Regions:
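Accessory "access/gating" subregions that flank catalytic or transport cores
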Residues: 35-38, 172, 176-204, 211-222, ...
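Active-site-surrounding "flap" and adjacent substrate/cofactor-binding loops of secreted or lumenal enzymes
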Residues: 62-109, 122-124, 143-163
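Mature N-terminal segment immediately following signal peptide/propeptide cleavage
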Residues: 31-34, 38-61
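Acidic, carboxylate-rich catalytic segments that either coordinate divalent cations
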Residues: 282, 286, 290-324, 329, ...
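Catalytic phosphate/nucleotide-handling subdomain of diverse soluble enzymes
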Residues: 56, 60, 67-89, 237-240, ...
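Positively charged n-region of N-terminal signal peptides that target proteins for export
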Residues: 1-4
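Active-site cavity-forming subdomains of large catalytic enzyme subunits
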Residues: 52, 114-120, 124, 129-245
Length: 452
């Protein structure tokens, strides 16, 4: 049975999505021209849900990160739904050792009294939020980005609290972000830090996983979000990898249109169609989007869709995606492209169900924590913390430890998702009034955001 793609929701309905109130009875024409009104207090709870949902998905996905990347032997025997709850299998990083996070492929949860540790899916976004607040700006300069990275990220050529890895001292940066940081330490400013002549990893996934939050800083206004995210994206990516990051930023901005009281699947497909308009025709991200969507609409299982992605892009190198021809480590398993396609599998087939989306993303393969964390944050922001806890049937920790991977923050790096959400309101206030041409009604505690 074919699944239908519904048209995009009128943007004016996002006020109700943010507040949980009933939808207004207004004409379609009025809905298309009326400014967006969003309750600030309710949106702070959405931001709290973003951090919590992202952390659950990140840590669950880390259990299977790089277990299955294609090729010969066990690493090419992809997981299926039957593997959920079963013992984790070794990754390419340590072929003789399963995950130290969890012995089984299952949800990783932190309950009150515990803390969520930072990872590269959350820590760069935390740094950017802090920098925007520190400088009281909506658009970070090259110098501000460089200084924030240097202030809060360890230099892997010097001792760190985390020991060593195969490239030096552990600093929890990889591929393009690591090279960008090295260039910053040498005095280079973004966007030259992603120049292919200086950074050979510019096609990797780094920019996507470190910039999605900018979409949430500009609710309902992807145009504003993309201006805010432009330089952070180009800090680590160029070309198609940057386009993929822009898609995710726009998707997060458009999520303000989603009504959590209605089925999420059709609404998520609708906003994805809008965000996909940013993907240039004739390039592989647009082709990947259409291919995965066609697999979903055909009635294929998610495993069949994932296997088709592997065959089409990693084996056959269709639609201009030729990473496999370059002899890269792990066949480009960190690349923005293959992980974009794999992530779309969990996005469409998860149909807006947080648990199902995390399950599929965790089992889909490749850099499985990154796309999964993206969707956990997106869906978590729509749900809010209370609904996330209801979905998992248990109270969950709101404590966050940024110093698991980074440095230089107050309180030895311990923070709280609710406080992080509250702090983000100042960023959004500035973006609404300064970048979007909107206003803040303090009496009603709402943003009034005009349409672009």
């Amino acid at each position: 049975m074919r699944r239908l793609i519904l048209p995009a929701l009128p943007l004016a309905l996002a006020a109700c999505a943010a507040t949980g109130t009933a939808f207004p009875t207004q004409s379609a024409a009025t809905a298309q021209t009326a400014p967006l009104e969003i309750d600030r207090a309710a949106y702070a709870r959405r931001m709290e849900g973003f951090w919590l949902g992202q952390s659950i998905a990140n840590w669950t996905g880390l259990v299977t990160e790089m277990d299955k990347i294609g090729g010969e032997g066990p690493r090419g025997e992809f997981y299926t739904r039957e593997d959920w709850g079963q013992p984790d299998q070794p990754s390419i990083f340590d072929p003789g050792q399963p995950s130290t996070i969890s012995p089984a492929i299952d949800f990783v949860l932190r309950t009150p009294g515990e803390s969520w540790g930072a990872d590269d899916d959350t820590d760069i976004e935390y740094i950017y939020q802090d920098a925007l607040l520190k400088h009281r700006t909506s658009i970070l300069t090259p110098e501000q980005i460089r200084q924030a990275w240097i202030d809060h990220i360890y230099d892997e050529t010097k001792p760190t609290p985390y020991g060593t890895d195969e490239t030096g001292y552990q600093n929890y940066l990889w591929v393009s972000n690591q090279r960008a940081h090295e260039l910053m330490l040498a005095g280079t400013l973004p966007p030259e830090t992603s120049d292919p002549a200086l950074n050979e990893h510019w096609e990797m996934i780094d920019a996507q996983l470190s910039t999605e939050i900018f979409g949430l800083f500009a609710p309902g206004r992807p145009d504003v979000a993309l201006r805010m995210a432009d330089l952070p994206i180009r800090t680590a990516a160029r070309g198609e990898a940057a386009d993929i990051a822009r898609f995710h930023v726009a998707l997060h901005a458009l999520s303000a249109k989603v009504d959590p009281q209605r089925p999420l699947g059709p609404q998520l497909r609708a906003i994805a169609e809008e965000a996909a308009e940013l993907l240039p025709e004739g390039e592989y991200p647009r082709a990947m989007y259409r291919f995965v969507l066609a697999q979903y609409e055909s009635g294929a299982t998610w495993e069949e869709a994932r296997d088709a992605v592997y065959q089409r892009y990693q084996v056959d190198m269709q639609d201009g995606y030729d990473i496999s021809s370059r002899g890269l480590y792990c066949n480009g398993c960190f690349a923005g492209g293959i992980n974009f396609a794999a992530g779309l599998v969990s996005y469409f087939y998860g149909e807006g169900d947080l648990r199902d989306t995390i399950r599929i993303g965790t089992l889909a393969g490749w850099d499985s924590d990154n796309p999964t964390a993206t969707w956990g944050g997106l869906i978590g922001s729509i749900m809010g913390r209370a609904a996330i806890e209801e979905a998992f049937g248990t109270p969950l920790s709101g404590s966050f430890h940024i110093h698991r991977t980074r440095k230089g923050f107050p309180n030895d790096g311990y923070d709280d998702f609710a406080a992080m959400g509250e702090r983000s309101l100042a960023i959004i206030d500035r973006a609404v009034a300064g970048e979007a041409g909107g206003s803040i009604d303090r009496a009603r505690n709402i943003w009034i955001i005009p349409r672009p």
